Amino acid sequence: MNPTETKAIPVSKQLEGPHSPNKKRHKKQAVKTEPEKKSQSTKPSVVHEKKTQEVKPKEHPEPKSLPTHSADAGSKRAHKEKAVSRSNEQPTSEKSTKPKAKPQDPTPSDGKLSVTGVSAASGKPAETKKDDKSLTSSVPAESKSSKPSGKSDMDAALDDLIDTLGGPEETEEDNTTYTGPEVLDPMSSTYIEELGKREVTLPPKYRELLDKKEGIPVPPPDTSKPLGPDDAIDALSLDLTCSSPTADGKKTEKEKSTGEVLKAQSVGVIKSAAAPPHEKKRRVEEDTMSDQALEALSASLGSRKSEPELDLSSIKEIDEAKAKEEKLKKCGEDDETVPPEYRLKPAMDKDGKPLLPEAEEKPKPLSESELIDELSEDFDQSKRKEKQSKPTEKTKESQATAPTPVGEAVSRTSLCCVQSAPPKPATGMVPDDAVEALAGSLGKKEADPEDGKPVEDKVKEKAKEEDREKLGEKEETIPPDYRLEEVKDKDGKTLPHKDPKEPVLPLSEDFVLDALSQDFAGPPAASSLFEDAKLSAAVSEVVSQTSAPTTHSAGPPPDTVSDDKKLDDALDQLSDSLGQRQPDPDENKPIEDKVKEKAEAEHRDKLGERDDTIPPEYRHLLDKDEEGKSTKPPTKKPEAPKKPEAAQDPIDALSGDFDRCPSTTETSENTTKDKDKKTASKSKAPKNGGKAKDSTKAKEETSKQKSDGKSTS
């Protein structure tokens, strides 16, 4: 290594310290571009070399001999090291010598040359400043060359690698103005409408194609003689068949004649070509086709013509007038727009009045019996004979051989209501064989599980129940003609209305006992049946509707038949097996309704219920009633002491209930009163049973209050 190079290394390190390797690469590229600029402009470089030689003619004699040394040695390493040292010591001399040392570098493009030529002219004042700085940087490098380098070989190798990156250079922006020609952009944006976007922009040729697709008839072009189906098949199947070479001449003539017509036809439409009639015996190989046939087919199609490019500049935009939508009334839409000639004129009467259209006569609905008769005509053999036409001779022969029971072929469902008469051999019927064949094809009828089910209405009605008051439910709704006239007594009080009833004849005790004990006795004789009918009517009125007292039936009379004794013995044995009956504690309790109702009883004061509510007009009536009545309570007769049951005879105990029965007149009055009370309660009872009970309770409470008030007064 030269001493100048070793001295230049620390200088390069000092300069490289604050900069990044990316900047080094960038600067190295800038160093390479500068000699290219200088090579283009030779005059400034020659002047610059003269100046540098005058300033330092003796200090640096090496750079002039360096290019020749590098070219002779051919070593890249020595050339790079020298280039680094030259960049540090004399950058100005390096710019002038690099184009000579590197003649193999590629020449820049035309665009770069034009730019470098401009920059070289304006970069002269900046180069003088760089020369001054390079002179100052070379002075400390010479002073450091006297010091020995005590670095190892590894450090030297690293330094050599670092030197290959190139030394840093001060980059100063050139504040030069561009003096070249003005750059102009002649391009301008223009809107071009798409072809076919509007109907105006469609060319006439495309219009014809659209008309064909839409189905608009177009006049057919003038064609020569039309080809028949045989000629077309022959022309298409010539290439597919493998024919002898002698027939090639004929093919070419046919191709020439039919080629023009077949060009317009598409190949995809023809699915299979049949062999010509005169070549039916030849076998066509479908799997393998010769290349010549395919080439001939492709040649017959012709080459595809390129579509001519349309000049978009010739297309002019046409502004269409904005069409407004107007609704026009059609003739006949409204009555006003109908012309008078076409208006319907109603048929006029003699007086000028329009005649009403006659109502169509509706057919009367047929009754069930008429419908059944119409449906059963087919089953009735006598009516069918009249309707049937004259049978043919074949049917007569078949009927003579074997009559056909037609009733079996009819399904049971169709004969649910109508039962046909037993079948008889009739003329003109279907033969047995045909009916049996048809019946065999039908198969057996499966039993329908829904046949036995009752018919249900599947129609769901949306009718709601509405509670309407019936005529006569309330007193207000009773017409005045049907209202009961109130019977008043001498004092003006209304008397209760009594229904007139037929007087009941008095019955003797023996007659009543016989009527009651009739069920306990043996079977009645045939002569007494007529009398029992009379007794039942009389006894029904005598017997009270209240619960009958428990009575023990008397034993049958001793003059009974032996059959009755056997029955009694059997009954006794059964009664012994049952055991004694235990008394039920709930037997004597009054019957209570177990239905719980939510209706609450509301007590309302009625007029006259209390002394406060009695009007003064009716006060004197109550005072008269109180004066007339005795204040002493009615004395009750002392009841006779009852005898113990053990002391009484069983006959007296049984007949005691019959002795206590009231007279017939009293019983009849009691029954009539009971009936009146029940009818009154039924008519006044509301629909809810709870309200009726509440009203009865309220009446009992009011009656108690009245009795208490009277006693206190």
From Swiss-Prot:
Specific inhibition of calpain (calcium-dependent cysteine protease). Plays a key role in postmortem tenderization of meat and have been proposed to be involved in muscle protein degradation in living tissue. Each of the four flexible inhibitory domains can inhibit one calcium-bound calpain molecule by occupying both sides of the active site. It holds the Pfam family Calpain_inhib. The modification N6-acetyllysine is found at residue 50. Belongs to the protease inhibitor I27 (calpastatin) family. Residues 370-379 have a biased composition (Acidic residues). Keywords: Acetylation, Isopeptide bond, Phosphoprotein, Protease inhibitor, Repeat, Thiol protease inhibitor, Ubl conjugation. PANTHER family: CALPASTATIN. Inhibitory domain repeats lie at residues 171-223, 307-359, 447-500, 583-636. It comes from the Eukaryota. Residues 46-63, 248-258, 304-332, 342-367, 380-397, 443-502, 583-646, 691-713 have a biased composition (Basic and acidic residues). Residues 1-187, 211-506, 536-713 are annotated as: Disordered. This is Calpastatin. Residues 21-30 have a biased composition (Basic residues). There is a cross-link at residue 32 (Glycyl lysine isopeptide (Lys-Gly) (interchain with G-Cter in SUMO2)). The modification Phosphothreonine is found at residue 136. The modification Phosphoserine is found at residues 87, 134, 244, 367, 369, 376, 441, 517, 528, 575, 577. InterPro entries: Calpastatin, Prot_inh_calpain. GO terms for cellular component: cytoplasm. One of its GO terms (molecular function) is calcium-dependent cysteine-type endopeptidase inhibitor activity.
